Amino acid sequence: MIYRWLLLVSCLLLALLAQRGAAKSSSPKIAPPTKIDHKPSSLFYFEDTDTVLMNTVNGDLLRSVDAGETWSVVEGDDGGMKHHVLLIRQHPYDNKKAYALGPNGRHWVTTDQAKTWASFNIAEFPAIRHYPLVFHGGDSSKVIFQGEECAGRYCIVRSYYTTDDFATVKLLRESTGGCAWAVGHPQFAEDLNLAEEIKDRSFCVVPGLKVPLPHANRLVYSDDYFKGNAEGTETKLQEGRPVSGVISTAAVKKFIVAAAKSKGTEELALYVTVDAKNWHRAEFDGHRIEEDAYTMLESTNYSLQVDVLTSPRSGMGVLFTSNSNGTYFTRNIEHTNRNSEGMVDFEKIAGIQGIVLVNTVQNPEEVESGSAKKKITSRISFDDGRTFQPLKSDGENLHLHSVTALRNIGRVFSSPAPGLVMGIGNTGNHLQEYAECNLYISDDAGVTWRRAIKHPHKYEFGDQGAVVIAVRDEGRVDKINYSLDHGKEWASVELQHKIYPTMVTTTPDSTSLKFIVVGSLKESQDGEHVIYSIDFDGLHERKCEEDDFEKWPARLDEHGKPDCLMGHKQFYMRRRANANCFVDEEFKDPQPIFEACKCTAEDFECEYRRTEDGKGCVIPSPLTPPEGECKKPDDKFMGPSGWRLIPGDACIRDGGENLDKEIERSCKDASSPSTDGKIRVTLQLLEARDYAQYYYLERQSSSSGSDETIIMLSSEHEVYVTHDHGKTWERPLKGEEITRVYLHPYSSDVAFLLTDGKEGFWTEDRGHTFKPFQAPAPPTQDRFLQVMAFHPVHKDRLIWTGAVDCHSGDCHSDAFIKKGRGKNWEPLLSYVQKCEFESRETRPNSTNLVYCEQFEKQSKNGRLQLLSSDDFFNDNEVQFVDVINYATMSEFIIVASRQPENPDSLVASTSVDGRTFARAQFPPNVQVPVQTAYTVLESSTHAVFLHVTASSTEGGEYGPIIKSNSNGTSYVLSISAVNRNSLGYVDFEKAQGLEGVAVVNVVSNVADVSKKVPKKLKTMITHNDGAQWMLLPPPTKDADGKSFGCSVVAGKGTDDCSLHLHGYTERKDERDTFASGSAIGLMMAVGNVGDHLAGGDEADTFITNDGGISWKSVKKGKYMWEYGDSGSVIVIVPESKPTKTIHYSLDEGDTWEEFQFSDVEVRINDISTVPSDTSKNFLLWARLSNSEVQDKFATFNIDFSGVRPRPCLLDENQGNSDDYYIWEPKHPFQENNCLFGHSEQYHRKKPSAQCWNDWRESHVHSIGTNCTCTRADYECDYNYEPQSDGSCALVPGLPKPDAMEICKKDPDTIEYWEPTGYRRIPQTTCQGGLNLDHFVSKPCPNKEEEYKQKHGISGVGLFFAIVTPLAVAGAAGYYAYSKWDGKFGQIRLGESAGTSQSFLSRDSWLVTVPIAIVAGTVAVARALPLLVTSLWRGASGFIRLGRGRGYSRPYASRGSFAARRGDYTSIVDDEDELLGVEDAELDEDDEA
């Protein structure tokens, strides 16, 4: 019996010993490693589970349900997932759902943590440039899937949606910028009771109504998946109005952010909303945001964090934090470190409010100058970024590698383990290279640090920080280090294989005792990988109890006491570092403990923004005092302080600060002196004798700020600058002799000021500062050549044409290139005439395409060749060997060269792609045996208007205007005998902003002109882009109410009685166009009523407000005019006679008021305003004589901003409102006002509305109707020409186009269409009706079976067939603000009047002072010739001092639209005939 008892006790002891040994092991358990053949591309845990998904680069999806111990390949129900998973995405708000996307249209979803997968089909490749999946923050069953189809740089995003986890899928809509849910995050609008209203709302970035270019994109929304209204409703982003140029949207916690950018500027506007209804533009404390130059950082529940790039060259930024509604941002810290991908060294410590780690650049000035590398230092904030301090380890400053040097997946420094922070870094003055650093750890949330292990390591936290592991991150390793006491002591465990570690991870909440380590067996990290699962469960024998925890304060103040943030202190119950236990609460996140604090000043924010001293708040709008108060200006009343408690702040009000209580305010604060109904005048007497040129630096609609900047060059070559439209002037470069000014045509804040030497100055901040620069050579001495050329995309890429060898007797022009900011000038080509970048958004692979005219054999006696190159002339191709000139107009490159068979005659050739040229085919009814001159007119409607000189007799110049097809090669006659002058300018002008409207003057007595009889001109107008023309209908009465001297037929012009207008060829200031791109439908002109155009002395001033359908006489005599506030103000001043009054109209010319601006009469030389005609300020350029001064140069600023009290209110949904009505242009020749397959509708302010437009861009309300197709929507196909009856017939001798070519080019094409002789014009949007281009379809070879299935053109096909060409062509009349520098116009190719010798002989002065490609119509309208000649290339340079006008005067008046015009030149009487401005290459800037 005793023996049995001893045996029993022995067994029990052995069992207990065995059990104790099992309870505590000496090292973690490492499961047998799993080998996989391919590199992992992504890995994630389903939250609060041990289930892991891993995607490999070969398309396999692996699943583990035991935290990585074992893995299996997911094949799907039918094996279709194997090798077909392109990428995986976890649902961010539902831990049961994930998505596997395939490359071939088949995708999969799981709703049970990858136990089962259901497939769904969307025949789209997942989007790469946009989010492929967009998740709903409130309903996890709602997901948007996005695929994209791209053609060159243009992409169409197709967004599909599901409301039932992809059991059903429907098309949401096509867009250009993708779609997103309004509720993009669970916190969005959660406290606003909007759940029902916005639960189905989605936003999409869609193309402009007329142009699919980024600057025209719109943000629309729908609450019913675009079912009820396919177009959706435009989002009112700014002051209740839509905004064009929206690039993208993003959901950031409780905010939605939209970014918009206008053409002509890199500046972005960020708009923010917290309720998906009310949006505000974010302000950044004076900083500007640029595209690809800001990063949305991890933000709090109550503010946004944004890092703004301030130094593109060196990668530094400024960190900003917003107020609670995201509208006003305060600067936190400067010189933050960024990389070229926009990643910022910034991380919030997980789980603890207010602690932020950032890296900054210690030596920003040296880095910016390029003389030193970055010296990076680390800083930490414990008060939400208000203040920063160094990290400390053993009394030294510590610096850590951060996001820009990310070496692992997940967060960089922290995890949900309370207070545990790790990083790779070093102590000293600044951060060293990664390999020279060590692993540091902090267990007090970054207050103090200690070195944990030498050398860099990958690391991870587990069991709420009770376990920390680290794997050395250099070379091959075969062990894992771990610590159980917050990194004080370390142990290690061996691995079976030596690996190059790529990932170290655990559950997202860091509560597990299990870790996964992934490594490659090869240093290249390709091919075979090993997965280790490490389990620490057996290292402690017990679970922590209450005494093992401490109440740990998450934040401490400067005195080491718990600190308050957002009205409370934060604590955690945290395991003590030396506790011999594990927390072992798997998947249970540590819970913070909050203790409320009394309110302090830090718990309040300004409703708008702080005052400059930071002590108070700016009130955003004038205060309204209580009724009965403010009987006197000096009275006081109780009003708001401007402060508010930060939403979500939990501070205790009793006994605390109360900054939001009402304060005593002066009644002066409640007045608004700027809206007192008065016009204000500011006179400035300038020291200069006169002005030679002036240039407006127009702000684009996405630009911040409100300055109205003008750079004026005086007759003494001194520079004057004003930022307030002439109210004050300054001389920033006093003593410097500036001879030329160039405005950057693609960046409206940039200007270059040149001298006659190598020295120059430039500004990139709108003339606030000027920096010197050194050119590679003095400017070319050929004053008709432009010195600078600019790249449309790479804004810092420049071409300089300089004078070389001028002291040796062989003075010629060489071209140099600067490839980017900070780069040196490099030689490009010698003996050149003109060099230009030919990169265009619509021209594939053209980024480096450059055209140059070069003299053959590098001799000025040689023929002029046209060369092209894609590698900056390391290699080049000769396009033409005997070119007269070339120019770019919209998408066309048009070249004038000598006919080989007849050198005295010219030939025009055209290219769209910049590679292949086709000879222009003139219509049979335009017979000009010797073609000596062309003028290429504006081409904004995807067709070239070309004036061909038929008579060049001095004083008798005229010729037909012909219009091309969409590739610029085949022409039809538009109108005959159009007037031109001896300089090549043509009386042709398109009405800006209106499709298809143009005005010309024709010679009515052609037969008599050949007999030296003076020309008799008649004015005609077209409303359908040149297809039909009519005489202008005259008004019934003149300005005095009297009848005209001819019989007026109401509403109709007759041969004996019609209105005739003085056109471009007669203008004193060629920039004064009839129309304005922002004042849609308005035109003003000087002319007369009769049977032909009379002399200037008989001229009166006329206006139309319906696009030229009807006209009204405004004033007797000749007046100059300007439009303001998009046409709601019109100011006129007498031309060529002294005055002290102006006349103005506030109702589109219906009534006129007189205003006296001066006590004495002055002579007005010019009147100007901002090029977009959106300002309320006008500037009179005058000469003043009074008792104090005699004949003094002066400017008068006339400010109308006080005339009206408020901005107009617009309801986009209703169209008509109290302030606006919907206006539809009339096209009298077209049925239902249809042109290009649609009718348009515009918002126009009611003339009676007492408010301001305050709109930087005119806005198309809608394409009112898409019309049915007619013959007018088709043109003749290639190799076909129009016949007398309007039909298209094959050109004799030419073959039919090979329709089957499409099958050869694209093997996937199923069918082709037999040619019919017609093709749809690119800009039409017509639907249905006449179908002339598709009669007979046939199957492609070997596609007969597929052909049997009916195929219609796809959505994207329709898009690119109908809409994309508009990107190239643009709709007529893009608003002033986005057209540039003489970019529209006439390109004159050819002769000079009055020469007796052969026009094209070598000795002809025309070749010596050669010939022009003249560009004319400014913006989409006017006939401002762009004379592109070998003597003049839009030179901003030559200054004519005699008339006070220089050649290069972009932005000088309404005629000089900022983004629509640039180098506008006056004609100097004694100069040779060929003048020019930059080629018209920006015509695509059409309205949204």
UniProtKB/Swiss-Prot annotation:
One Pfam family linked to the record: Sortilin_C
Keyword vocabulary terms for this entry: Glycoprotein, Golgi apparatus, Membrane, Protein transport, Receptor, Repeat, Signal, Transmembrane, Transmembrane helix, Transport
Chief place of localization: Golgi
Bilayer disposition of the protein: Multi-pass membrane protein
Signal peptide: 1-23
Segments annotated as BNR repeats: 63-72, 380-389, 440-450, 482-490, 720-730, 1102-1112, 1144-1153
Lumenal topological domain residue ranges: 24-1351, 1427-1488
Stored InterPro entries: Sialidase_sf, Sortilin_C, Sortilin_N, VPS10, VPS10-sortilin, WD40/YVTN_repeat-like_dom_sf
Record topological domains on the Cytoplasmic side: 1373-1405
Cellular localisation: Golgi apparatus, trans-Golgi network membrane; Prevacuolar compartment membrane
Residues carrying sugar: N301, N325, N481, N845, N967, N1266
Record GO cellular component, one term: Golgi apparatus
Residue intervals passing through the bilayer: 1352-1372, 1406-1426
Entry remark concerning the domains of this protein: The lumenal domain contains two regions of approximately 650 AA that exhibit 20% identity. The cytoplasmic domain may serve as a Golgi retention/recycling signal.
Further remark: Present with 7210 molecules/cell in log phase SD medium.
Role noted for this protein: Functions as a sorting receptor in the Golgi compartment required for the intracellular sorting and delivery of soluble vacuolar proteins, like carboxypeptidase Y (CPY) and proteinase A. Executes multiple rounds of sorting by cycling between the late Golgi and a prevacuolar endosome-like compartment.
Name of this protein: Vacuolar protein sorting/targeting protein 10
Gene that encodes the chain: vps10
